[in-house]
From Swiss-Prot:
CDD domains: Pat_TGL3_like (cd07229)
The organism of origin for this protein: Schizosaccharomyces pombe (strain 972 / ATCC 24843) (Fission yeast)
Top-level taxon in the UniProt lineage: Eukaryota
Protein known as: Triacylglycerol lipase ptl1
GO molecular function: triacylglycerol lipase activity
InterPro entries given in the database record: Acyl_Trfase/lysoPLipase (IPR016035), NTE (IPR050301), PNPLA_dom (IPR002641), Triacylglycerol_lipase_N (IPR021771)
Enzyme class: hydrolase
Localization: Lipid droplet
UniProt xrefs under PANTHER family: NEUROPATHY TARGET ESTERASE/SWISS CHEESE D.MELANOGASTER, TRIACYLGLYCEROL LIPASE 3
PROSITE patterns: PNPLA
Reactions mediated catalytically: a triacylglycerol + H2O = a diacylglycerol + a fatty acid + H(+)
Length: 545
């Protein structure tokens, strides 16, 4: 059985390389065909240029605006009408909120927001509204989100509401709006892609508080969970050079590394970097240090019959690094890594399965037992941002935010083939004909709420990065691949997540500004003491002999 698992593990790692070759070839073919048909102009060629030349969000934004104006699609943004969202409702609400704020009508604004603070209010989160233009969506939608955030700021600063009323409002608003989870899903050969996604979200102030990861995605999620906000800029700036130092200490760059991991830059190098940063910190300690919540998804073979989620609620004293090793138990170097827990005296002990009560242990991996559902239950998550880098699942995914260069008919056929493959694999899983060890390779878990999936886009030149000895430029390149995959999703994420982040920050500031009233005893003690001292002094001065 072990030999069979090793065979499939090696085959899975090679899928990434094979799939990279296939996707790169078709990307190159579509690009060449598109450019020849467009004769070097139009938005389709613009997409090729943007993926090729842009190295920052600012450059991408400028070029996106230029392409939209040149293609004639820029006017679409300034036309509110569309059958893809309720533009009349959004326009009416924007006008009402602006009027309440200008007139300082606090209580009507309060009631209005409590009933309308929804992530997809009026269907403004519809992903098809963000593929018409590269640079953004309808101006009306952006104005509505901006006005909602202006009203939240107004309610936070107003003196007409008591502290208790503000706390009740922001607490209810956060529960009603829900939270977002950034889920780093797998990725043997493309683990650095996750880091690029996180870097872009942080730079745009869109990094969620709740993080989750499995396999190599667990490495990136755990790394982000131990750095405070003021420390993250330093991490993102120094990560490539620090990882390159570790790569220089590795001398084994043979073809066997490609066969084993699908890439010359294998997971052990990234793991060495993360291990040095995590130390013996636990889930509870990481949350208390940074306020970020990390969820590590452990596979069935590590703890029970179904994937389990380890976080500061379910495993507060477990070392994050040991959970990361369990999540990467597919790799030979972490095959027998146990979970470790920190004791009150600072020592560690091995956690056996009997130390935990897994709520869905032994059950088939249904909707309630998958990690997405578990995270949603614990943390009120109703929106997932999934960074998908599991190469075996790429054929079954359809990135709705990609501005595809193929015709509409061809795109529908590609989508049909992907859906059919996913459906057949899921049928085999339901019938019990797909072995559990192979399930994670071909079947993705059902997401019980709204989500957006970010997948890397490859070019034909990416082949050299997978089959050559890694360099500093290669590390920077794979991070850039993740950044580029995120740029096109920024307008959608700003609409879906900006209000949530504002609510979190304002609630935090409101809590920090609270001053506990002094008790009667605390007030009386120093006053009485000073009064007695003054009375003694006065008696001495005016003492009548």
């Amino acid at each position: 059985m072990t030999a069979l698992f090793n065979f499939w593990r090696i085959m899975y790692a090679n899928i990434s390389s094979i799939w990279l070759l296939v996707v790169s070839f078709f990307e190159w073919l579509f690009s060449a065909t598109s450019i020849s048909q467009q004769r070097g102009s139009g938005p389709r060629k613009g997409k090729v240029v943007m993926n090729k030349d842009c190295r920052s969000w600012e450059d991408w934004k400028v070029l996106a605006t230029t392409i939209d104006k040149a293609s004639g699609r820029w006017k679409w943004r300034f036309t509110p009408a569309s059958d893809k969202y309720d533009y009349l409702l959004i326009d009416r609400c924007t006008v009402s909120l602006k009027r309440y704020r200008q007139r300082k009508s606090v209580y009507p604004m309060l009631m209005f927001l409590r009933s309308s603070l929804l992530r997809n209010f009026g269907n403004i989160g519809n992903s098809s509204l963000y593929t018409e233009n590269y640079s953004g969506t309808k101006i009306l939608i952006e104005e509505y989100v901006r006005e909602v955030n202006n009203c939240l700021e107004f309610l936070y600063h107003t003196k007409r509401l008591s502290y208790d009323v503000k706390c009740d409002f922001f607490s209810a608003a956060r529960i009603s709006f829900g939270t977002t989870c950034l889920y780093f899903n797998g990725g043997t050969a493309f683990g650095l892609y996750h880091f690029g996604v996180a870097k872009t979200l942080w730079k745009r102030n869109l990094l969620p508080q709740i993080l989750a990861g499995c396999a190599s995605g667990a490495l990136i999620a755990s790394l982000l969970s131990v750095y405070r906000d003021e420390e993250l800029n330093g991490l993102f700036d120094t990560f490539p050079s620090e990882l390159w130092k570790i790569c220089q200490q590795t001398s084994d760059y043979s073809l066997s590394k490609v066969v084993e991991y699908g890439n010359m830059l294998d997971i052990s190098m990234i793991a060495s970097f993360v291990r040095q940063r995590l130390g013996t910190i636990t889930f509870q300690e990481a949350f208390e240090r940074t306020g970020r919540i990390v969820n590590i998804v452990a596979p069935p073979s590590a703890v029970s019959g179904s994937p389990q989620v380890l976080n500061y609620f379910t495993a507060p004293n477990v070392l994050i690094w040991s959970a990361v090793c369990s999540s990467n138990s597919w790799a030979a170097i972490y095959r027998s890594s146990p979970l470790l827990a920190k004791l009150p005296d600072g020592s560690t002990e091995v956690c056996t399965p009997k130390n935990f009560i897994w709520p869905y242990a032994g059950l088939p991996n249904t909707g309630r037992s998958n990690p997405y559902a578990r995270i949603s239950e614990i943390f009120n998550v109703n929106h997932f941002v999934i960074t998908q880098s599991r190469p075996s699942l790429f054929p079954t995914f359809y990135d709705e935010l990609h501005h595809h260069r193929v015709s509409g008919y061809s795109l529908k056929m590609i989508r049909l083939v992907g859906l059919e493959m996913a459906y057949r694999f899921r049928q085999l899983d339901i019938l019990g004909l797909l072995p559990p060890r192979l399930r994670r390779f071909f079947v993705d878990d059902y997401v019980p709420s709204a989500y957006i999936t970010l997948t890397p886009t490859f070019s034909f030149s990416d082949i050299k990065h997978a089959f050559t000895k890694p360099s500093l430029s290669d590390i920077q390149y794979w991070i850039l691949v993740g950044e580029r995959a995120t740029w096109q999703a920024i307008p959608l994420l700003q609409v879906r997540c900006k209000t949530e982040i504002s609510l979190r920050h304002l609630s935090k500031n409101l809590t920090n500004s609270y001053v506990e009233p002094l008790s009667v005893n605390n007030l009386a003690s120093p006053f009485v003491t000073n009064l007695e001292e003054n009375q003694e002094k006065m008696l001495k001065i005016f003492k009548v002999k």
